[in-house]
Amino acid sequence: MEIIENFLPEEQFKKIEDRVFGPNFPWYFQDGIVTTGDGNFKLTHLLYAHGNVNSDEFNLFRPVYEKFDMLSILKIKLNCIPKIETVRENGMHKDVDTNVDFTTAILYMNTNNGYTRFETGEKIMSERNKLIVFDGKIKHCGTTNSCDAHRRVLVNLNFIEDK
């Protein structure tokens, strides 16, 4: 696992941050955090999946995905999990169901008391402009947050590396 603090230069990160946290960024309701109907909900914005750009916002995130040597992108998605009373872990999962080796990267858009936990037991706190990179076949789970941040927002990238 690799952890990179201050992943993007401040000016680049701020441009993305201002748009994502602005009043007109399009978020879409998902009935479930890990699986449909799991009793929770989140808002998402799918930038890229199944070989297609799915959003006019895709190019805004170019400074993020261009930092990787990718053979192909599998999926890029933003997650927005609203604040609740207590921090709750969601189910362990892999982001993409595939037999090929792939990499997952998570860019935390804001600091809050949520985190990502791995099946290995490691726990990475959500901190603004921090990126974690790991083997996509490692199961992990995200959480809610219960601090003064009204939401936990992250960018989730899944891709095949050009090795």
Residue map of PLM features:
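Short beta-strand His + acidic residue motifs that chelate non-heme Fe in jelly-roll/DSBH
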Residues: 91-93, 139-147
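A short beta-strand-loop-beta hairpin characteristic of the jelly-roll/cupin
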Residues: 86-92, 99-102, 108-127
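A short hydrophobic beta-strand segment most commonly corresponding to one strand
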Residues: 105-107, 148-163
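Non-heme Fe(II)/2-oxoglutarate
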Residues: 1-72
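A generic structural micro-feature
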Residues: 96-101, 147-151
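Conserved metal-binding segment of the jelly-roll/cupin
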Residues: 124-141
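A short glycine-rich, His/Asp/Glu-containing loop-to-beta-strand
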Residues: 66-86
